[in-house]
Amino acid sequence: MFFSLLLMLGLTEAEKIKICLQKQVNSSFSLHNGFGGNLYATEEKRMFELVKPKAGASVLNQSTWIGFGDSRTDQSNSAFPRSLMSAKTADKFRSLSGGSLMLSMFGPPGKVDYLYQGCGKHKVFYEGVNWSPHAAIDCYRKNWTDIKLNFQKSIYELASQSHCMSLVNALDKTIPLQVTKGVAKNCNNSFLKNPALYTQEVKPLEQICGEENLAFFTLPTQFGTYECKLHLVASCYFIYDSKEVYNKRGCGNYFQVIYDSSGKVVGGLDNRVSPYTGNSGDTPTMQCDMLQLKPGRYSVRSSPRFLLMPERSYCFDMKEKGPVTAVQSIWGKGRKSDYAVDQACLSTPGCMLIQKQKPYIGEADDHHGDQEMRELLSGLDYEARCISQSGWVNETSPFTEEYLLPPKFGRCPLAAKEESIPKIPDGLLIPTSGTDTTVTKPKSRIFGIDDLIIGLLFVAIVEAGIGGYLLGSRKESGGGVTKESAEKGFEKIGNDIQILRSSTNIAIEKLNDRISHDEQAIRDLTLEIENARSEALLGELGIIRALLVGNISIGLQESLWELASEITNRAGDLAVEVSPGCWIIDNNICDQSCQNFIFKFNETAPVPTIPPLDTKIDLQSDPFYWGSSLGLAITAANLMAALVISGIAICRTK
């Protein structure tokens, strides 16, 4: 893939000819300047192309993610074969048809109760639709959407800080003797599994208003094999319009309060000190607040008549931060949905929402097998280099045309304009340099360019500036910076980029913890920071480009030196090197076959250190490049590949 050209120049003495290694440059070449050497090239290309994120969900590592779902990810469901994802992806989900995390938390009568649990750095949630307005769950509340919103938000928040999570479906408890398990007409003559309803008989006509309820529950440090550092607990209580609505018999105010082991109030409602704020008439409503509690023993105190007892929780190990993806979970036509999942994710730092642009149109049935959702989830079959609210990227380029919206994780590209990305020479390359490069053998080569520039993420301007990359002194002959200087420059850039990449990723993770989608000021600040990083990276790439050009030029000159040395060795006394890369041969002493041996290697073998591609040799004259200026024309499919002799010609002048 590389070619060299030899030029023969005629001398005035008829029996002698002058043959030189020579550049062949015309107006189609462009000049590229570098640190330590320059290049002529027939083509040029950008160091990186802009990439465009793909819409939908993906993961950074196939072995470290887990999903939580329902019938749309349940392979045992009859509608699954025409559902939304591959069987391979569905295997990663903990799912049961008809289930949802909230259904398992509260356990309304007649609904699916599934033990959700699992571990993974990245958690994908595609569930929630089974608790929606279509489910028509009442139990002292006509609309559970705001509770669902707070529940899902708490789940996403804690999941983003944990490696493992699990439903704890049976808390240890102690209840007072005077209460019994209760039911409610508007709960199908039953009640929720969590909280459980306990009732106490009250006889005010006999001046017996009942006793205050005192109960205890324990949040475990471990549930099965799952460690519990923090629990999500639903603190539920009734809301009454007034004291008279709660207790028309004059037996005191309503209260339902949770205390920790030190006696501190952690949740509940106390109408002994707080006003009544209900608006439901004679029927109370039930409110459930989401509490994040550490393992331990807690007490519940309530007024007579009713006790709402926490009997379930979700436990989290809080061991590892990681991405959370929430997939919009809505019904197809004919069923009413809510958008609690969407709102919960958008208001939770670190949560990426996968959202449809069109109504859900199922293919297996009205509610399973939507084509748009299938496309949005197809990325779960692959590993991405970057995942973000804008989509996922698996290309190696560090630049994208548009700013990727946070949150984002992985090796994410920065926004840049195409015209700002530096260009490098390509196609046929010819080095130019000072006149001393073929008489002084270079000490060493420079390697590692591809490793250095492929996969760059974020870099910033370092304190040393550009000058910090040009260590060492210039050669007195004017041939550019020394090779040792260039090597140190590459090493410094590599080290700086690795350090800055690490520190920048840490900074981005901290920003993910702070950013929510409605915090415009933080979003604007993040955008400014990323724009600065993009400009810094482009500046670094400009330096790398200049060093790269110089490195290629030096490398080609070294190969040229090897070629010249081999020719001189083969010629022995038959050719006299009169200047770097030029020899005089007596045509009467060294005939055509002799010249073929010296310059064409008998058309059988190239220079031993240079792998062959084309060993044909032709000689041609180009008097414009007479003298000691040296070069080697190459094709640059691989910038650091070895050279091959090709295209040497002899021109005689008597």
UniProtKB/Swiss-Prot annotation:
Glycosylation site positions: N26, N61, N143, N188, N394, N551, N602
Enzyme class name: hydrolase
Region (N-acetyl-9-O-acetylneuraminic acid binding): 157-309
Segments for region (Esterase domain-2): 309-363
Region (Fusion domain-1): 15-40
Residues in compartment: Cytoplasmic: 651-654
One function term, GO molecular function aspect: sialate 9-O-acetylesterase activity
Stretches assigned to the Extracellular side: 15-629
Region (Fusion domain-2): 364-654
GO cellular component, one term: membrane
Family according to the record: Belongs to the influenza viruses hemagglutinin family.
Stated name of the protein: Hemagglutinin-esterase-fusion glycoprotein
